[in-house]
Amino acid sequence: MTPPPAKRQKRNEYRKANTAVADDASEIRLPQKKFYRQRAHANPFSDHQLNYPLSPAHMDWSSHYPAFVDPEPSHTNLAGTRKLLKDVEVVDIGCGFGGLLIGLAPLLPESLIVGMEIRVSVLEYVTARIQALRSQQQKLRSSAIPSESSPAAQQPQQHHQQQLQATETAADAASPSSPDATGETLSLVPGNYQNISAIRSNTMKFFPNFFARHQLSKIFICFPDPHFKARKHKARIISETLNAEYAYALRPGGLLYTITDVEEYHHWVLRHFGEEGADAGQNAGVTELFERVSDEELEKDDCVRVMKEATEEGKKVTRNKGNKYVAVFRRKADPEWPA
């Protein structure tokens, strides 16, 4: 039997060793991206072996957000799995290596954020990265709480809660809103990365299977594959059909964020949201459901800053001194039915 290529074997050995270290819990290491290499793109029209729920009410989120699982065991969904205390409301479509998820986690600590990625190895990296960051935060929290053998541990429980809150407040003030380029954090951050996760999914096919009507408050589409060839435009993640699905899942007042370094793709986005160059009747439905957010509002939105600076593609564009084109659209209230 022919052995696997040397590079692939090395990657497999690294992942096994990394899993052993994680199980040991004596040392917490962040995963190395070089051991999770994969092709830059995946064909969304291929029949990938994907697991997806029958409906949003069948989706099992409990394994993704264990800190938010409803403590009442009888509260289960249609699939019989435990419900969460709150719904997922922020989605990063095509999350890549998870830079935006990591950046948004401390910025939106009370919101559950999920990344959707179709590539297997990339998803494995993001999952390992999130688990490592959670373990780091747990270790920092444990070191911040006095041990039971110390004199301080004999004080009332109320004092413990006040001390922990003071520690977290100081950490929040001292730490930046997002980690550095390596993803390492040396202090506690709001939410402790318990509010982020990633799933493997084909958004073009199964987006409505995961999210109910008006469930989402934010959707991010960061540096999507531009598919330059005209015959590939049907694979673009922004289209009339997909925009209708995004509008279905977004609640009124919710925001859809887009950013790209390709100017032609930026104009494609504007056309498909009825902002420029479209026929009056072509995108009539879209213009009834979305309106573009002004540049003045975007300057005050921290999510736009994170979207530009925290993603891996955004950092690469900055290094190459390229341009970043941002467009954000607000979901309007549903139009009234004609009498």
Swiss-Prot record:
Endpoints of the signal sequence: none
Major subcellular location class: nucleus
EC number: 2.1.1.33
Catalytic reaction annotation: guanosine(46) in tRNA + S-adenosyl-L-methionine = N(7)-methylguanosine(46) in tRNA + S-adenosyl-L-homocysteine
Catalytic residues of the enzyme: D225
Pathway this chain belongs to: tRNA modification; N(7)-methylguanine-tRNA biosynthesis
Region: Disordered, residue numbers: 1-20, 141-186
Cellular location(s): Nucleus
GO molecular function (one): tRNA binding
Stored Gene3D superfamilies: Vaccinia Virus protein VP39
Biased composition range(s): Low complexity: 142-181
GO cellular component, one term: nucleus
Keyword list, A-Z: Methyltransferase, Nucleus, RNA-binding, S-adenosyl-L-methionine, Transferase, tRNA processing, tRNA-binding
Matches recorded under InterPro entries: SAM-dependent_MTases_sf, Trm8_euk, tRNA_(Gua-N-7)_MeTrfase_Trmb
Annotated positions binding S-adenosyl-L-methionine: G94, E117, I118, N202, T203, C222, T311, E312, E313
Keyword Nucleotidyltransferase among record annotations: no
Its biological purpose: Catalyzes the formation of N(7)-methylguanine at position 46 (m7G46) in tRNA.
HAMAP family, per database record: tRNA_methyltr_TrmB_euk
Subunit note: Forms a complex with trm82.
Family membership noted in the UniProt record: Belongs to the class I-like SAM-binding methyltransferase superfamily. TrmB family.
Protein's name according to its UniProt entry: tRNA (guanine-N(7)-)-methyltransferase
Name of the gene this protein is made from: trm8
